Amino acid sequence: GPDGNSVFLEAPEGLILVDTGRHPAHRDKLLAYAEARGKPIVAIVNTHWHLDHTTGNADILAAYPGADVYASLAIDGALAGFLRESREKAEAFLASGKASAEQAAEIRRGHAALDDAEALRPTVPVTASGERTIAGRALQLNLAPYAATEGDVWIYDEAAGLLIAGDLVVGLVPFMDTACPEGWRGALDAIAATPFTTLVPGHGEVMDRQEFLAWRGAYNAFLNCAASTGTKEACVAGWQRDAAAFIPEGDEERVADMAGYYFDTRLRSGQEERRRYCAQAG
């Protein structure tokens, strides 16, 4: 799949890198930027553990071994559960001989990331929301529990009016593979209550406040439709209509398929599956 958005923040002590992508070409751009700036990467912030945002960690840390990694502890549960299961499925796909050369390369790169799991784990765990000074730059690191993942980190830079949302905001369709949809709704409420002027989503184009509010409205309407007696077709069509401004031309059919998949597997599945990635009682 595509790489998530990466963001560099300049700090007095060096560069802060938010998310490291998946593919070698993406990694090379990140390393080239740091070299061109003449500053070391002194900190990585991972918004969440999905491999399209974290696979580059190992290579960045190899180039800058002193860098700290700020992330939630959700990676531990992911390594024991979702990522282990995904690896087993991927290995079976490789063994079937049906994978294209590009797919095989991507799978092997993901496996290499899992084999170097320490690079995915935080050296500075984000266990609660709060102000932090990273490399001399004041930032607010916010923890959204049980949202797009078990622990999503979103960053607010008050001085710049900048909010980096990770996959809590994904232009074309919310990626619900490991999501608790209602927890995610709450995270979007917290973002809306933050006085940012510019928002960087996990995938897609940079948004202003009004664009974010429109996307959040589309997200809420999709959940509300799924909770109603509306049909799958009506709910998917509603997403496509409400989020049309964020869906790249030519991606409409793919988005419909993805929205339909998440409708079936996350929003309109049985209660146990629907709450699989939500906080468990007791």
Q: Residue ranges of each PLM-predicted region?
A:
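Conserved beta-strand hairpin/beta-sheet module of binuclear metal-dependent hydrolase folds
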Residues: 1-36, 153-167
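Active-site environment of divalent metal-dependent phosphoester hydrolases
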Residues: 3, 24-25, 49-54, 76-80, ...
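Active-site neighborhood of phospho(di)ester-bond hydrolases with catalytic His/Asp-centered motifs
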Residues: 18-21, 42-50, 70-73, 143-144, ...
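Accessory terminal helices/loops
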Residues: 106-107, 192-198, 206-282
